[in-house]
Amino acid sequence: ILSRSESDITGIPTGFAEMDKMTAGLQRGDLIIVAGRPSMGKTSLAINIAENAAIGNQIPTAIFSMEMSAEQLGFRMIGSIGRVNQSKLRTGKLSDDDWPRVNSAVSLMSNAPIFIDDAPALTPTEIRARARRLKRRNNLGLIVIDYMQLMHDAGTKENRATEISEISRSLKALAKEIDVPVIALSQLNRS
């Protein structure tokens, strides 16, 4: 018999109350595609969700970033967690008020189960192998992929739309196989 839990969130909390209310959190085995035009905040949203999972809830989180280097992603996360302006971080022109927040953010990140893989142009098979390893070694709980159009499917010789469709199917199979939510970012173009 099912009993009502204290929280209405049955999956991984995103850190966004309204989203969690609508979805009950990110559910195991789900593929969540976040699509939008360039520079609309897809990566920022995914990073915020990953931070909430790994730092706020100690859920081992893998980020496969084919767009940004691990260093760039790390700086974005430090800025987000520490509430420090990105350009100040990049240039090193931090105020005396910024330093404690940066130090706190670095400390939180160093103790969080966040795994960043910035290898370019991964295939679904390569992501599956890496995710399986993280699941086995670290009990992986969430995967973020930034972004699908930078992936390639070695077995597909069709057009790009068919290839992206096949990549989506592979990512859904991965989510079900290792029983974690997978957030895949997708860039929409004008056409």
Name each region found by the language model.
Residues 38:
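The conserved Walker
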